[in-house]
Design a protein with these regions (language model features):
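PLP-dependent enzyme catalytic core of the Aspartate aminotransferase-like
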Residues: 79-82, 93-127
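Active-site C-terminal subdomain of aminotransferase-like
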Residues: 1-52, 56-59
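A short linear hydrophobic-aromatic micro-motif
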Residues: 53-56, 86-92
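Generic non-transmembrane alpha-helical segments
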Residues: 44-52, 75-85, 121-125
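Conserved PLP-binding catalytic core of the aspartate aminotransferase-like
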Residues: 54-83
């Protein structure tokens, strides 16, 4: 019965693990390059957001995600969502002291042009 279940959490975890294994196997030695790409894209996004007035929350090492302070973050996030963006995780939902902070993530699926457009949209929606 468990083997045929499609809504069982264990089945879902197994399918997610299988998908990850297939993806990583296809990458092979390219996983290091993928990690470097992700980090470079996140660094670009962090820099572009900072240039538009969104300060990084922490000055610490990061990989492909970072926290940024955006004035009126909940309002800005709603505006971004209405424009079709997935702006990140609102940290204020978890920590009251970070009510104007968002966790942003960049992966190999995010290109430089999309990062620039996102940073422009954040600046526009924050006005």
């Amino acid at each position: 019965r468990r083997e045929k279940a499609t809504s069982n959490i264990c089945t879902n975890q197994g399918l997610c693990a299988l998908r990850a294994i297939i993806y990583l196997s296809a990458l092979g030695n390219g996983i290091r390059e993928l990690a470097l790409i992700n980090h470079r894209l996140a660094a670009r996004c962090k820099k572009e957001l900072a240039a538009r007035g969104c300060a990084p929350l922490f000055d610490r090492p990061y990989f492909n995600e970072f926290a940024v302070r955006i004035k009126k973050a909940p309002t800005v996030m709603k505006r971004l969502e209405s424009e079709g963006y997935v702006p990140g995780v609102h940290l204020g939902d978890y920590y009251k002291e970070y009510k104007d902070c968002v966790m942003v993530c960049c992966t190999e699926m995010t290109g430089p042009a999309e990062i620039d457009a996102f940073a422009d949209a954040v600046a526009r929606c924050a006005k």
